[in-house]
Regions:
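Conserved serine/cysteine hydrolase catalytic core
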Residues: 8-11, 112-137, 175-196
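A conserved short beta-strand
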Residues: 94-109
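Conserved alpha/beta-hydrolase fold motif
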Residues: 69, 73-76, 102
Length: 196
């Protein structure tokens, strides 16, 4: 029940949006699908070609999260999903604790991220949704399970919004789906324990 209270506690509080685009420099999936802006309040571009670049990128993400004026909704695309998962597992708990949740769009196949973003196989320390536009959900199932994320296969056209309204739409989507996940997990827990 604590999780539900925590979720409803920030329902009317805007989240700071921190975006991590993919390394391929194309429009991020959230922009193509929903018309959300390419960047949130803070954007941490993924320009990583070596472990040195990766560590600099992680320090920039740490700073963006620390400087956010509210809890953070992390929105990542492509290789940015694997990079964000790597960051979440290995960065300071104070920084990661500021993340309310993550929307992870079109993560790459596991083999693509294994070199620079290999990380412990542990659930992410915040709720996360993987949105797989088109393509097969099977392509990302391993990542989804390893991250403890919920998968949303999205292959139908969506209404497109713009500007600040678009980020409010992203927050509502995240909250609605997260509340459904929590309610489902609570119901499942009650069924297992026989509590009604």
């Amino acid at each position: 029940m604590t999780a539900i209270a925590a979720l409803t506690g920030f329902r009317n509080t805007p989240l700071s949006i921190v975006t991590v685009g993919g390394a391929d420099r194309r429009a991020p999936a959230w922009e193509r699908m929903f018309g959300w802006p390419a960047e949130g309040a803070a954007a941490v571009p993924l320009e990583v070609r070596s472990t040195h670049d990766r560590n600099i990128w992680a320090a920039r993400l740490d700073r963006a999260v620390r400087e956010a004026d509210a809890r953070v909704l992390l929105v990542a695309d492509g290789l940015g999903c694997a990079a964000s998962a790597w960051w979440a597992r290995l960065s300071p708990a104070d920084d990661v604790g500021r993340i309310a949740g993550a929307l992870l769009f079109a993560p790459p196949a596991e083999a693509e991220d294994s070199a620079l973003f290999a990380s412990p196989k542990a659930r992410l320390p915040f709720p996360s949704l993987v949105i797989q536009p088109g393509g097969s959900p099977e392509d990302v199932r391993t990542a989804v399970q390893g991250w403890g994320s919920r998968l949303v296969a999205a292959d139908r056209p969506r209404d497109r919004a713009a500007g600040i309204v678009a980020w409010r739409q992203a927050q509502r989507l995240f909250l609605r789906l997260t509340e459904q996940m929590v309610e489902h997990d609570v119901d499942r827990g009650r069924a297992i324990t026989g509590w009604r």
